[in-house]
Amino acid sequence: MKIAITRGLDLSLQGSPKESGFLKRIDPALVSVDLRPYSALALKLKVEQDDVISSGSPIAEYKNFPGVFITSPVSGIVKEIRRGEKRSLLDVVIKKTPGQNLTEYSYDLSKLSRAELLEIFKKEGLFALFKQRPFDIPALPTQTPRDVFINLADNRPFTPSTEKQLAVFSSREEGFYVFNVGVRAVAKLFGLCPHIVSTDRLALPEKDLKSIAHLHKITGPYPSGSPSTHIHYIAPITNEKDIVFTLSFQEVLTIGHLFLKGRILNEQVVALAGSGLKSSLRRYVITTKGANFESLLPLQDISSDVSLISGDPLTGRLCDRESLPCLGMRDSTISVLPNPKTRQAFNFLRLGINKPTHTRTYLSGFLKRKHTYMDPDTNLHGETRPIIDTEIYDKVMPLKIPVVPLIKAVITKDFELACMLGFLEVCPEDFALPTFIDPSKTEMLTIIKDALKDYAKETGILNLEYEDKE
C-alpha cells in the first residue's frame, strides 16, 4: 500500500549533523535506564543503590502485571536512583564496569511455542519495548493486539535515518537480517503479520519480508513518519477494543539481536545536532543506549545560553546540565538550541525575513525560497493567550481530526466527545506541529499526554483485573 500525505510541515532546521562515512564509537562512563516512559504504570524497583548488575538484569517490574521486566543494557554498579514529584521514578543511573561481559542467551526461535516466547519477551525486557494504542501507554500483557505497526519512516527533525541506524552492524545486510529475525519473532508472538511502514528512499529486502509482513510506503512532510499517521490510513482505531502495538526500527533490531546473537543489543546511532552546537561537534556517533551527555559532548565548552534536549526539538525532553543529563529510552538525538536571555528590541516592527512562520506573520511567510533553513530558539515570542479557533492547526495535522474541538474536549474532560473526535487515535507527538505554529502558545503536547493518562486510568485498563466490557 502506498500512502501520500499532503498535510504537515517540512522543517528545515539549521544545525543538522555532518554526514560522514565513518561513525566514531564512544563508550560512556554512565548509562541511564529511563523509566519516564512508564509513568502511566506502577513500577516495582528490583535494584538498590550500589548493587552490582549484569547486562539484561531486571531494573524494574510492572507492579500490576508481574513478570514484565525493564532490563539493564549494560553491566555495572547502580550509581543513583532518581525520582521526581511524588517520588515518581525517573531513571536508574549505572556506572559501567570496564571490559563489558554481555550476558549471553540461547534461544531457538523455531522451537519455541507462543507461550514460551511470551515469557522470554517479558523476562528479557523485550515486551517493555512495545507501545500500545489507544492511550499511547506501554503495552500490557493482558491485551491481544489487533495489529502491530513497525515504523521505518521516522522523519522527526535531526533523527538518524533507518539506513544510518544500521551502522552499528558490520554491514547493511547483517543489519537487515537481524531485523528480519525480529519481525519473525513479533509475528510468531502474536500470530499475525505486522505492518512495516517505510519510505521510497529506503531499499528494503522485500523478498524476505513479504511472506511475514504487510509492506507499506509513505511519502509526505513531517509527521508522515508518525505511527499515528500510519495507523490512521492503514487500519484506523475506531473503539477501545482496537488494540494496536507499535515498535520502532531500533526496537525490532533489539528483539532480533537477542534471538540471533544471544545477547542484548545495547548500541545505537545518536545524532548530535542543533544550531546551539558548534559545527565541529555536529555529527553522528555510535554509543550505548542511555549514554550520559557529557560522554558525547564537551559540556564545559558549550555556552550556558543553550537548551539541552534529549530527543528532537519538537517532542524531546528538556534536560538540566547540572543534573547529569542522559539519553531517554526512545531518543536517538541530542538537540542543542539557543536559549536567548534577552528580548529583541522592537521585534514587532521587524520584517522577519528569516523567521519561521506558518501564518504569514513575518515577511518570510510570503517568500517562496527552496533552501531557507530556520534557526529557531526556545523563546515563545509572546505570552500565553486564549486558544484561537482557526483552521491553521488542521493544515499541519495529517490525521482527519479537528484539532481545536479535540483540545477543548480533553481540557474539559469530556472524553465521550473526545473519542468521537478521534482521541483514541492520537499520541502527544501528533500535536507537535500544531503547538509549534500555535499563536496562542498552548502546550498541546502536555494537554494530550495528561488527558491520555487520565482516560486510561478512568477505563481501568492499567489494572490486572481489567476485562473488556462487551
UniProtKB/Swiss-Prot annotation:
Biological-process GO terms, alphabetical: sodium ion transport
This protein's UniProt keywords: Ion transport, NAD, Sodium, Sodium transport, Translocase, Transport, Ubiquinone
EC number annotated for this UniProt entry: 7.2.1.1
Pfam families membership: NQRA_2nd, NQRA_N, NQRA_SLBB
Reactions that this protein is recorded to catalyse: a ubiquinone + n Na(+)(in) + NADH + H(+) = a ubiquinol + n Na(+)(out) + NAD(+)
Keyword Cytoplasm: no
Top EC group: translocase
MF-aspect GO terms: oxidoreductase activity, acting on NAD(P)H, quinone or similar compound as acceptor
PANTHER family, sorted: NA(+)-TRANSLOCATING NADH-QUINONE REDUCTASE SUBUNIT A
Family: Belongs to the NqrA family.
HAMAP family (UniProt xref): NqrA
Functional description taken from the UniProt entry: NQR complex catalyzes the reduction of ubiquinone-1 to ubiquinol by two successive reactions, coupled with the transport of Na(+) ions from the cytoplasm to the periplasm. NqrA to NqrE are probably involved in the second step, the conversion of ubisemiquinone to ubiquinol.
Record-linked NCBIfam families: nqrA, PRK05352.1-1
Name this protein carries in UniProt: Na(+)-translocating NADH-quinone reductase subunit A
Organism per entry: Chlamydia caviae (strain ATCC VR-813 / DSM 19441 / 03DC25 / GPIC)
Source species taxonomy: Bacteria, Pseudomonadati, Chlamydiota, Chlamydiia, Chlamydiales
Gene symbol of the encoding locus: nqrA
